[in-house]
Amino acid sequence: MHPAFSSLRFWTLLLPGCAFLFYMTPLLLRTVGIRAFTMASDSYVSGSLSAAYVTCPNDTVAKDIARGLVERKLAACVNVIPQITSIYEWKGKLEEDTEVLLMIKTRSSKVSALTEYVRSVHPYEVCEVISLPIEQGNPPYLKWVGDIVPE
């Protein structure tokens, strides 16, 4: 064996590099593969769309907000889900209310504008507006959401 291969310095330099490649190669290949597939097939880019959730005090407020979001192209679709029960602490007191939930499909880039619109028309002092990125779903539906809500 060549003396350089038996030296401790050689192995201390080689092993961290091998470990890095061992752990990072699958991640790098996955990322490159997803990007290549997306470019080749014009398919959905994970996280480019979001589902946002807003609670409302009643059906009238919920439908008004839903219509406003769709009319302003801040959402492609809003599901109005009646009669949810919310239990939360507010100003030191445990509260329980019947509310209406909006499930909103939009572009992730529009979540800030969507939030500002909801805050401007919502009757609550502190309204709930939260969002989660959409990782995957029915490709034709996701394309439709992207087509309806402009960049």
Swiss-Prot record:
InterPro entries this protein is in?
Answer: Ion_tolerance_CutA, N-reg_PII-like_a/b, N-reg_PII/ATP_PRibTrfase_C
- GO molecular function terms attached to this record: copper ion binding
**Quick one: signal sequence residues?**
1-36
Report keywords, A-Z.
Signal
What Gene3D superfamilies does this protein's entry cite? 3.30.70.120
Q: Which Gene Ontology BP terms does the record give? A: response to metal ion
Q: What family, per the record?
A: Belongs to the CutA family.
- Subunit and partners: Homotrimer.
The record's section on PANTHER family has: DIVALENT CATION TOLERANCE CUTA-RELATED, PROTEIN CUTA
Q: What is this protein called?
A: Protein CutA homolog
Origin species:
Xenopus laevis (African clawed frog)
Which classification does the entry list for the species? Eukaryota, Metazoa, Chordata, Craniata, Vertebrata
